[in-house]
Amino acid sequence: MANVALIGCTGMVGAHILTSLIANPAVTRIDTISRRTPQAASSAPQAKLTTIVSTDTSKWASELSSLTPIPSIFISALGTTRAAAGSFENQYKLDHDLNLEMAKAARDAGTKVYVLISSSGADVKSNFAYTRMKGEIEEGVKALGFERTVILRPGLIAGQREESRPAEAVARFFAGALGKVHSSLKDGWAQESDVIGKAAVNAGLKALNGEVPAGSEKVWYLYGSDIIQHGKE
């Protein structure tokens, strides 16, 4: 049985992570920390889900540190866009700095398993600022030395976003069209947000139980086909 803390619970993937956690009988308690109340909170059992809502993200780490019982799994689907943040500098503060601050707080509290929703192409040596930032987040988390770290690298995230992203909307349309012809035409480069959410939960629980592939005992990467496999179990 697992106690899980989640940040990024109001985003497209994070919302599906939360609904998967609520539905999973292996999860006994969920704590979310967010700037607004997650939609799923209205129908979730109060005994299972506790929501901490604060627009002051500087207090999030202390909120996490004070959780009892200590979360055995910490999941981050936290992220924003340059447009929403106003600049890449502001995006970096949230996506990179806050993510690592929260990861350190979870590690220091005694959390065993850390699950990160990253991105395909994440690489500290990337010429692109976004994928370089994602790579820096991954490296920062791995350096913290959790008992087990799980990193999901989805491709295009298919699903309905609250905010408008025209270029992504076009790509999601084509992904959906190809998926209707045959799933194999889409699964390698695009994954549905609900599938990613369920994969994050299933992989986190498996990591907690030591059920990870050989060679991935400390850090377990899940790519497109892995996400599909674990998200459809």
From Swiss-Prot:
For this UniProt record, give its keywords in alphabetical order, as a comma-separated list. Answer: Membrane, Mitochondrion, Mitochondrion outer membrane, Transit peptide
Compartment(s): Mitochondrion outer membrane
Q: Where is the signal peptide?
A: none
Q: How does it sit in the membrane?
A: Peripheral membrane protein
| Transit peptide found in the keyword field | yes
Which residues constitute the organelle targeting sequence? 1-36
Read off the InterPro entries from this record.
Answer: Him1/Fmp52 (IPR014843), NAD(P)-bd_dom_sf (IPR036291)
Q: Which GO terms describe its cellular component?
A: cytoplasm; mitochondrial outer membrane
Keyword flag Ribosomal protein: no
Which biological process, per GO, is one annotated for this protein?
import into nucleus
The similarity annotation says: Belongs to the FMP52 family.
Q: Protein name, please?
A: Protein fmp52, mitochondrial
Q: In which organism is this protein found?
A: Emericella nidulans (strain FGSC A4 / ATCC 38163 / CBS 112.46 / NRRL 194 / M139)
Taxonomic lineage of the native organism: Eukaryota, Fungi, Dikarya, Ascomycota, Pezizomycotina
* Gene name linked to the record: fmp52
